[in-house]
Amino acid sequence: MNKVLNGIFQFVVILGVGFCGGYVLANLAKDKIVSLQEPNFLLLVLAAVISFVLHIIIHEAGHLVFGLLTGYKFVSFRVFNVLIDKEKNDKIRLRTVQGVDGTGGQCLMSPPKIKNGTFPFKLYLAGGVTFNIIFSGLVWLIAPSFYTLLFALIGIILALTNAIPMGFNDGMSMKLCLQNEVNRSAIHLSLIVNYYATQGKSYVVSYPEVLEEIKKLDINERNYITDFLSFMEIEYYQDKFELEKVHDLLLKLYYENPDLILPYKIEVMRSLIQLTSLFEPNSNLIDELLANKNVKARLKAREPQNKTILAVYEWRVKNNPQKALAILEEGRKILHRSPHLYAKIIDEKYINYIESLITSEIEQKI
């Protein structure tokens, strides 16, 4: 019930912000609007789409610029499914990846070291909103028209809906970081983990002592920032191929934390399909997970991990090892679509591992 009310509240806030922003901008610009030529409707629609895409780019560029100004290092820049990232040897590459549910873009950076329980997070988190507002005003002032007014309106709406704390937006991240040291440490750690992943390494595997440090954290109230820490433990055991332990941790997350944010929830659910198929192929949980519309949509994405999940399901649940091997081969051909270098390494290891299990089973039956 609280989830439904929260969703309604967020919708009302966005609607209210849009109305108020439009009303204020229209009043401020009314003298100029009177003298402007009436716009073409189709061009307005096209301008709205282009403006939305441009503001996502501008928003992420704001994070990038303010991050660089405060000592961060570039990791990746994504707009929808297009990603620019830096891998080993500072190699920059452009590629397509699966987008993150609930986000239009994302700029990830490696932060400066944490000192005295904090680090420069304010400008980095505020950079996107700041750039949206600045560019909205500049474009309108430089070339006033119905189209640039629309551009400005979309920018202001995007800025406000990111600034007002809700869901897992910039405003909420800022609010949580300002609340306490635990949240600041957790978000700092998540940024470090992402940086290591682009370098083909796991931070938690490189520094396993961090798991004990996480257990000592006094987390009074869970949120999406602290929830990330649970995935670090899962990553550690996944890297070690302790799959029963991974399965247990995923089940715990699934049943005890139903309010996980959507991207996290989808990751838990699709991973559970793979491991439950492996260990409990007759479990009703598998059908429950596969019936979820978000999971269904995600499994259609051309990702190596999806191929491994579907291969295990085909092998253990559908009892079709030959088809499973064919699916694994499909996954091997798209390893370049893994979200980062560490994921690519893990995806390849798991494709080989599952393939060896299936091949061994086939040979035993001959």
Task: Please name every model-derived segment.
Residues S110-K201:
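Hydrophobic transmembrane alpha-helical segments that form the core helix bundle
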Residues V205-D218, L243-N257, E280-A297, N320-I334, ...:
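Alpha-helical repeat scaffolds
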Residues Y264-T276, P304-V312, H340-Q364:
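TPR/TPR-like alpha-solenoid helical repeat scaffolds
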Residues M1-A48:
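Topogenic membrane-insertion module of multi-pass membrane proteins
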Residues L229-Y236, L272, L310-A311:
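Structural register within alpha-helical repeat arrays
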